[in-house]
């Protein structure tokens, strides 16, 4: 596991073999990296969580922010294991009560991430979790949202990186930890 490149940890190889590639989903020309097949294998799922926990357990992370939807699969078990709170970053109008939001650009239009006001406080040390980084737009929005309330974003963690889309370059200099790189 690395900020830059896959290492030879046999657990990473096991995780990589469980990721299903679905051609032409959700549209023609996309090679969709499906992590749901990792969840079907208890060992691969546990190894995924364990690798992140080993990396973050001694970094004084106080909040794990998971990006909807697949960040919700990996974020909560990481948060529990390292003794941090879990904060869901959701699509618009999915959270009850008062929220704060950050807009970001998509290929065709805009979207936004929301979180509850008061869920993250100034001085919190945050880890942002998602399943995959492609263009980096969603992770960048998450970083901006957390920093706006005074949190320190320590790192972003993703199971998969698609490096040819250069998403890492949009992360405002924040480190990215990924397990599997697809070219």
UniProtKB/Swiss-Prot annotation:
Disruption phenotype: No visible phenotype under normal growth conditions. InterPro entries: Ade_phspho_trans, Adenine_PRTase, PRibTrfase_dom, PRTase-like. It catalyses: AMP + diphosphate = 5-phospho-alpha-D-ribose 1-diphosphate + adenine. Its main location: cytoplasm. Keywords: Cytoplasm, Glycosyltransferase, Purine salvage, Transferase. Gene3D superfamilies: 3.40.50.2020. Pathway: Purine metabolism; AMP biosynthesis via salvage pathway; AMP from adenine: step 1/1. This is Adenine phosphoribosyltransferase 3.
